[in-house]
Every structure is written in C-alpha cells, then in structure tokens.
Amino acid sequence: MGWLGDNSEDSTGAVRWVMDALLGKRESPSQKYRREFAQDDTNNRLQVPRSAGARRRRTGSLDSEFRARYELLPDETEGAGASLLSPVDLRPAGTAARESGTPGRAGWAGGAAGTLGGGDGGCDGGRDGDTFGRARGSEDVAFRPPRADNPLVSALFAQPSSPDAGLPGSFPGRAPRARDPTHDYLALLDQLARNNRDLHSLQQDLEAREERDRRETSYRDRYLQLRQELIQELKQSKTMYDNYTALYERYKALKDAEHPDYAELVSKLEAQIVDLTIADQQKDRRHQEELLRLQLQYEARIHELERKLNHQNSTYTANDTATPASTVDSGSISPYHKYNDTIDTQFLNHIVK
C-alpha cells in the first residue's frame, strides 16, 4: 500500500488528504493518518529507540506530527502560552525542518520516492514508530507559521466569489483584484511574536528594577540601622570618657592630699638656700669692710703713735746731749718699748670671729 499516488479506494494520496481536511469526508484526517501509520509500521517493522521525553498523544485532537506534516495551526488549548512567546519562523518549511531537526512535509512524505514533486527528504528513521505502546514525542516540535503558498491557508482566507460574475450580458467592468490576506496574517503573527518578545524583555526589565529597588531599600535600611548603632556607640563612649575624666580628677586630688608636692617643697628649699647664701655673702662683705676699716684705723693709730714716739725720741735725744747718759732716770722708760704687732693681729682676729 503506497502513501501517495495510488488510485485504489483504500489509498490516500495528497489530494484526498487535502479534500478530506477541507470538505470533511467520512473519515477524519487524523484517523486516516493513524491508520496509515499503523499499517506502515506493521509492514515495515520500524525499530527505533524510544524517546526519553515522549508522552502519550491526545486522542481527541490532531497530533503535533500531523500538524507539522501538513503545516496546520495548533489547538487553542494546547501550547498556547509557549507559542505566543516563541518567535515566528518565516523560513520555508523544508529549511526550518532541516535546521531544527523537526520533520516537515518533505520528511514525512519521503516514504514514496518521487511523490509530491520529489520531496527533499526520506522517511525519518529516528522517529518513534511503534504503534503498540510507544508514543511519539511532540514537545520537540517548534511552532512555525504556515507558508504563504500553503493551499489550506489560502482556502481558509479566500473571499467567496459571486456565481453571477461570469454570466453573459453584464457590463464588463474592471476585474476585481484578488486580495490575499495570507501575507497580512503572517505579518500579524510576526508582529505578535515581536510584541511578545518586547513584553518579555519589558517584564525582565521591570523585574530587574524591582530587584534593584529591593536591594536599595535593604541597603538603606541597613545603613540607617548601622548609623543608629554608631550614634549609640558614640554616646556611650562620650559618657565613659566623661566618667573616666571625673574619676581621674578625683584620684589626682586624693593623691595630692595624701602626699605633698615635693617639687614645690624642693623649690622652696632652694629659694631658702639662695636667700641664706646671699645673706652670708652680705655678712662676709660687711665683715671684710669692718676688717678693712679697723685695719686702717689701727694703721693710722700706729702711725700716730710712731710719730709721737719719734717726737719723744727726738726730744730725749736732745736732752741726752744736754745731760750725760748716766744721769738718765731708769723710771722714765717709754711705755711702748715692749709693743708687739702680734697683739693687734690677735685682737683683730677675735673681733672677726
């Protein structure tokens, strides 16, 4: 049984698939796809390793492989949040499938060589094809917008034409310009993807700003707390310093009261010594002056006495010349014949002492 190009009743070619998808025949495309794949798996016995992240397919909707094969839009309830945030890929289906590793139309239609205009890929042997229990993984199928030349999208967005447009007898006017909304649809999807990316970046910026505001708030609170703690520490330090100063003043006063100031006492004694020294010097000077005065006085007295003595001696000498020596009275001897200057020296020393 072939996939495409077979004219038998049980065969399903590309045209039958499209007609069934658009017009809704007796069998849904998903049921035909499952039946064809199960038959192909039974005939070919594909043995491939099971995907670690595979999950069971949904029986009530189209499979992701089927949507990827025919480039159909996904369900609104399945993967809506992830598709809105993912960027729109405007590349051809074959190129995107080869780069992302997701089987496209050419990959799934490669079972029959030369069908559908000679597809550029064969049957993907790496996909899970076990009908009895092993499901295909659909989480690796990336969202791709339909191509502009997709007949399904063109048929969905085509404007209905009037059946009377080609009747004869009407005035031939300008042929209406066919407006293909496919490009607008793709541009809208691309704009939505860009908006989603901008919203995502804006959300990240807002989260970063909120995180920065939280950090700044925490830093400000911590700074105020540390500032208050430092103020308290400074107040306690000032109080402790004041108490220490007062205690030191009291200790110094007690020490001065118990022990006199020896330095002051020494200075007083030194002053007394200086005063006594000056007094002694003055006393010595007075004694020297008194001694000099007495010496001069005694010298004057001595000179006077010597003068008198010489005068008397001269007188006696004259008398002696007049009278003989034998007649001189022994009782008239001068009282100074026994004078000695030692007596005067001892007397002066006694006065000085």
From Swiss-Prot:
The keyword Transferase does not apply. Component of the spindle pole body (SPB) required for insertion of the nascent SPB into the nuclear envelope and for the proper execution of spindle pole body (SPB) duplication. Connects the central plaque of the SPB with the half-bridge. Required for proper localization of CDC5 at the SPB and for proper M-phase progression. Keywords: Coiled coil, Cytoplasm, Cytoskeleton. Its main location: cytoplasm. Homodimer. It is found in: Cytoplasm, Cytoskeleton, Microtubule organizing center, Spindle pole body. Pfam families: BBP1_C, BBP1_N. It comes from Eremothecium gossypii (strain ATCC 10895 / CBS 109.51 / FGSC 9923 / NRRL Y-1056) (Yeast). Belongs to the BBP1 family. GO terms for cellular component: cytoplasm; spindle pole body. This is Spindle pole component BBP1.
